[in-house]
Regions:
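Short glycine-rich loop/turn motifs
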Residues: 14, 69, 157-162, 254
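Alpha-helical support elements that line or immediately flank enzyme active sites
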Residues: 18-46, 81-100, 161-205, 210-230
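Structural signal for hydrophobic packing residues in well-ordered secondary-structure cores
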Residues: 40, 94-101, 105, 118, ...
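Beta-strand segments within the central parallel beta-sheet cores of soluble alpha/beta enzyme folds
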Residues: 47-48, 197-203, 231-241, 268-272
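Gly/Pro-rich active-site capping loops and adjacent beta-alpha segments
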Residues: 89-108, 183, 188, 242-272
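Helix-loop-helix junctions that connect adjacent transmembrane helices in secondary transporters/permeases
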Residues: 111-191
Length: 272
């Protein structure tokens, strides 16, 4: 079976590496990428200023920039991209980036979020019956807390995208994704194209488990942008370290519950 990184590519195919934030939360004060751009073998450096369309790779909320502009909101967030003749050149060049940050307070745990009131939005409540009354009348009651750690989608094939520019405004993207249509829409939005200009091909995936529903948007967009701006095929393959850092997770949970039940074990009320 052939996966994205196994596809035979032309010898002029470019390799891409993302420049990532060193802070969980910080203001970008200045960014000098001139030494990166002038490094031998580097073809182009991409930032938010190079995006002709919308600087967003989120599935729908519009809150996940392709490249951070003024604020970084998580460790490892993409700030720029290096397009080079090979991946070794990109790795060496990326170390020459001169970015100055002002570190800001970061919320890193559920407890910190609860203490500071830093939540993403109001809770969604699903209710059936008069649970408070049922709990009050229950003969037996229990309450407690369950803590679940986060999980990483450990697919064997990492996030991967390979893009080629076609005639006129056409762009073809090969990628490992559970959601080719979303990739099509996000690439079109970022490049300022119509959906019919973008063809997405997913022959197979080396695992996904939900981790390739939307997380493939970023590499697909950047590869497509690189191919469009340079006129050469371009590939962005996350190594395992970058995949762990850049992608979202099944996050931690803290579950608080109250349950009322009878002597025979019949549960008559649950609040979670």
């Amino acid at each position: 079976a052939k996966y994205v990184d196994d596809i035979a590519v032309p010898p002029n195919t470019l390799q891409i590496l993302l420049g990532q934030s060193k802070f969980a939360h910080a203001k970008i004060l200045s960014m000098d990428l001139s030494q990166v751009e002038n490094f031998p073998g580097v073809i182009k450096v991409l930032t938010a200023a190079d995006i002709p369309g919308t600087n967003d790779c989120s599935p729908f909320a519009g809150d996940d920039p392709i490249f951070a502009e003024n604020i970084v909101s998580y460790f490892g967030q993409s700030v720029f991209a290096v397009i080079a003749e090979d991946i070794k050149i990109a790795r060496n060049a990326i170390e020459l980036a001169d970015i100055k940050y002002e570190e800001l307070p970061a919320v890193l745990t559920i407890d910190q979020a609860l203490e500071t009131g830093n939540v993403l939005g109001p809770p969604a409540v699903i209710e059936c019956g008069k649970v408070d009354q049922a709990l009050a009348k229950s003969k037996n009651k229990l309450e407690g807390k369950i803590i679940l750690g986060g999980q990483e989608h450990f697919y064997l094939e990492g996030q991967a995208a390979y893009a080629c520019a076609g005639e006129d405004t056409d762009i073809v993207v090969h990628c490992s994704t559970q959601h080719p249509t979303e990739i099509q829409h996000k690439v079109a939005m970022a490049l300022g194209l119509s959906n019919h200009d973008v063809t997405v091909i997913t022959r197979r995936m080396g695992g996904g488990f939900g981790g390739k529903e939307s997380q493939g948007n970023l590499p697909a967009i950047v590869a497509a942008l690189a191919a469009k701006l340079t006129g050469r095929p371009a590939k962005l393959i996350y190594d395992r370290d970058d995949d762990f850092i850049l992608t979202g997770k099944r996050h931690d949970f803290q579950i608080f519950y109250k349950v009322g039940f009878e002597d025979n074990g019949l549960i008559n009320s649950v609040i979670v």
